[in-house]
């Protein structure tokens, strides 16, 4: 039996990253390395701790930290997150870029700073997974991503359509209509899944919750593929897509939603699409159960989204130029 203990001091700070204890060590997403050298990043995790645009209860500003904390557990499985057959860290330079700052209370500063930071990453060739924060943070991320990849298909998991027509107002319920009007996303090549609140489609393809439950996972995925096709797409996941039994810690919960198992199956089914960006938003830990099930769900689903980005990236790199 070896007497080697990997936790004994060696004088090398890299030992601090070798923890196999999920309750200790660095608080980065999946224990990814952390830096801001944009030319040395393939897959970037970016937090946007913002919740000023909420219309119900705030608290999503604490979402990125809570999701990172819960992601430490999945990082312990060196072979990768089940059921994926590989570790992202073996095939990509995965980096937690940490959070985009802004002057407290200044929404315009948040929008500008997110566009600047995500723009730097995307222009350097990285694919970005963003952790919110309320759902408005998707708007500047989409803006920066579309500036490089062109108008995008949106694959939107949510209890709300976020397409209210409020004129020039931007909040966490209006930004996708604004993005469509700005030419950032293409409604007819986009699909919204899980809606269970009143909405006007504004040209988006919508699979309401009742229809999702009626047709099931397989047909829902088939419909998503028919709509999106080979178009470059962005996956946005509001945690209130889930039923509050699985995700109570969010600002605008709506009963009658899918389970975490159904959500993961849906994300796995997108593995062959050309996903260039993604987000996980609206985790508000102040309302979470003591077991932190919402943050755990968010961390796991965000990790699945990171796999979508990695797989699509590999296919683009392998394609003939």
Residue ranges and their predicted role:
Residues 2-321:
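Conserved alpha-helical scaffold segments that buttress catalytic/binding sites
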């Amino acid at each position: 039996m070896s007497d080697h203990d990997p936790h004994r001091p060696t004088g090398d700070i890299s030992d601090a990253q070798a923890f196999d204890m999920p309750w200790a060590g660095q608080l980065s997403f999946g224990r990814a390395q952390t830096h801001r050298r944009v030319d040395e990043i393939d897959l970037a995790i970016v937090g946007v701790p913002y919740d000023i645009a909420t219309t119900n209860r705030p608290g999503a500003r604490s979402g990125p930290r809570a999701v990172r904390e819960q992601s430490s557990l999945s990082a312990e499985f060196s072979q990768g997150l089940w059921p994926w057959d590989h570790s992202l860290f073996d095939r990509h330079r995965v980096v937690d870029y940490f959070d985009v700052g802004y002057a407290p209370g200044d929404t315009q500063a948040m929008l500008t700073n997110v566009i600047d930071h995500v723009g730097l990453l995307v222009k350097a060739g990285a694919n970005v997974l963003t952790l919110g924060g309320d759902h408005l943070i998707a708007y500047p991320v989409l803006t920066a991503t579309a500036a490089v990849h062109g108008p995008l298909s949106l694959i939107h998991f949510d209890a709300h359509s976020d397409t209210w027509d409020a004129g020039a107002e931007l909040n966490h319920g209006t930004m996708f209509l604004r993005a469509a009007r700005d030419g950032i996303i293409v409604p007819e090549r986009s699909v919204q899944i899980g809606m269970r609140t009143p909405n006007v489609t504004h040209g988006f393809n919508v699979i309401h919750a009742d229809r999702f439950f009626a047709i099931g996972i397989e047909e829902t995925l088939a419909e998503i593929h028919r709509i999106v096709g080979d178009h470059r797409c962005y996956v946005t996941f509001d945690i209130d897509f889930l039923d509050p039994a699985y995700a109570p810690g969010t600002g605008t919960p709506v009963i009658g939603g899918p389970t975490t198992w159904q959500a993961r199956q849906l994300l796995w089914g997108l593995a062959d699409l050309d996903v260039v960006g993604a987000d996980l938003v609206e985790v508000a830990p102040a309302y979470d159960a003591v077991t932190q099930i919402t943050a755990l769900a968010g961390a796991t689903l965000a990790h699945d989204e990171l796999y979508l980005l990695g797989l699509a990236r590999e296919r683009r790199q392998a394609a003939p130029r």
